[in-house]
Amino acid sequence: MAHVGDCTQTPWLPVLVVSLMCSARAEYSNCGENEYYNQTTGLCQECPPCGPGEEPYLSCGYGTKDEDYGCVPCPAEKFSKGGYQICRRHKDCEGFFRATVLTPGDMENDAECGPCLPGYYMLENRPRNIYGMVCYSCLLAPPNTKECVGATSGASANFPGTSGSSTLSPFQHAHKELSGQGHLATALIIAMSTIFIMAIAIVLIIMFYILKTKPSAPACCTSHPGKSVEAQVSKDEEKKEAPDNVVMFSEKDEFEKLTATPAKPTKSENDASSENEQLLSRSVDSDEEPAPDKQGSPELCLLSLVHLAREKSATSNKSAGIQSRRKKILDVYANVCGVVEGLSPTELPFDCLEKTSRMLSSTYNSEKAVVKTWRHLAESFGLKRDEIGGMTDGMQLFDRISTAGYSIPELLTKLVQIERLDAVESLCADILEWAGVVPPASQPHAAS
């Protein structure tokens, strides 16, 4: 039975311990800021206060007290009124308040400041706190302030310099600081003005360079457009060598007869003109494949000259037709230059540009004639190969040259230079139809 009774009384022990701890915590929490709990009396007791010139060492209050709690004297330049206050620093009359020291401070009392230093004054409507005792420089004082009358002479008299050194008054220090700030502001203004002027100069130089490098108007729109273009075409034709039309004779005696001829025939002006006419016919018709340039033996050159002499009568009729059509194209070309002067290619109708783009494509000729395409036209405008490689057709080229500032007459001039008179004729006809201008009367083509 006793064993059973011990088991029934054991659960009450934790409850008793918890209740005692809660009651002790309640006693500690009832103590004030400067009180500690006395376990002997079970009451809150006041912490021992410190005397003047002393401050508490360690902590005491709110029910707790350090074992080594006590009071220690204040260090130098600090004071305390006693009680539970810590030591505080004396007023810095000269450094902070800009005033004279009336009474120096000690361990029990604070320092007392007197009147303002020379060159400083106190505000009349000052706040009623510690900042109301601050003195301000006479440089910022309103006129007729009595403390600042004769501040310059008084400041220099009250602050004499020591032997071998010079001492500036507070008034002179303030004046020096303000003058330094003024010089800094002036330097900043000059620097900003210089940067602004340089930026404007750079912009003007860039604009002048752009205007200077802008392409000028084409020569086709001058007083004699047809003649200038014709001269340009003739110059391009002269730079190219005439293709050698080589004829291989089967008769052996005829070949030996030609090789035995001592006199070498010379080309006449009619032969040279016929060769140029053949080149122009390839550009207009775009259906003949030019023969590759070859450098053979003297016998082959003689054969070529003989062949040209035999075909002189046959090519004369064809050259007359080519010249007639060439003159017609140049007349229409000159008329179009005057109509669309200053317009860009993208201002033309879409169908007109698309038709010209198809004519300049590499798949335009069914017989695979070797003619200049829109890529050659792009090279004549000075575009780089990587830029041309990013294009797919002539429409993109027209957009590119329009963005670069080229006009329709310049486009026609480039087409003439690359020997695409067929494209020039088609584009001029579409432009005249779009502009509502009657084309010049054309002569009938001569039979070729």
Swiss-Prot record:
Sugar attachment sites: 38
Skewed-composition ranges (Basic and acidic residues): 233-243
Stretches in topological domain Extracellular: 27-187
Residues of the Death domain: 358-431
Renumbered ranges of TNFR-Cys repeats: 30-71, 73-113, 115-148
InterPro entries tied to this protein: DEATH-like_dom_sf (IPR011029), Death_EDAR (IPR056762), EDAR_N (IPR034052), TNR19/27/EDAR (IPR047526)
Highest taxon, organism lineage: Eukaryota
Signal peptide: 1-26
One GO MF term: transmembrane signaling receptor activity
Tissue expression pattern: Detected in fetal kidney, lung, skin and cultured neonatal epidermal keratinocytes. Not detected in lymphoblast and fibroblast cell lines.
Positions of transmembrane segments: 188-208
Short name of one Pfam family: Death_EDAR
GO cellular component, one term: apical part of cell
This protein's record includes keyword Transcription: no
Location in or out of the cell: Membrane
Region (Disordered): 220-297
Example GO BP: positive regulation of gene expression
Alphabetical UniProt keywords: Apoptosis, Developmental protein, Differentiation, Disease variant, Disulfide bond, Ectodermal dysplasia, Glycoprotein, Membrane, Receptor, Repeat, Signal, Transmembrane, Transmembrane helix
Cytoplasmic face of the membrane: 209-448
Disulfide bonds: 31-44, 47-60, 50-71, 74-87, 93-113, 135-148
Membrane topology: Single-pass type I membrane protein
Residue ranges, compositional bias (Polar residues): 271-283
Subunit structure: Binds to EDARADD. Associates with TRAF1, TRAF2, TRAF3 and NIK.
Function summary: Receptor for EDA isoform A1, but not for EDA isoform A2. Mediates the activation of NF-kappa-B and JNK. May promote caspase-independent cell death.
Noted disease: Ectodermal dysplasia 10A, hypohidrotic/hair/nail type, autosomal dominant: A form of ectodermal dysplasia, a heterogeneous group of disorders due to abnormal development of two or more ectodermal structures. It is an autosomal dominant condition characterized by hypotrichosis, abnormal or missing teeth, and hypohidrosis due to the absence of sweat glands. Ectodermal dysplasia 10B, hypohidrotic/hair/tooth type, autosomal recessive: A disorder due to abnormal development of two or more ectodermal structures, and characterized by sparse hair (atrichosis or hypotrichosis), abnormal or missing teeth and the inability to sweat due to the absence of sweat glands.
Name of the protein this chain belongs to: Tumor necrosis factor receptor superfamily member EDAR
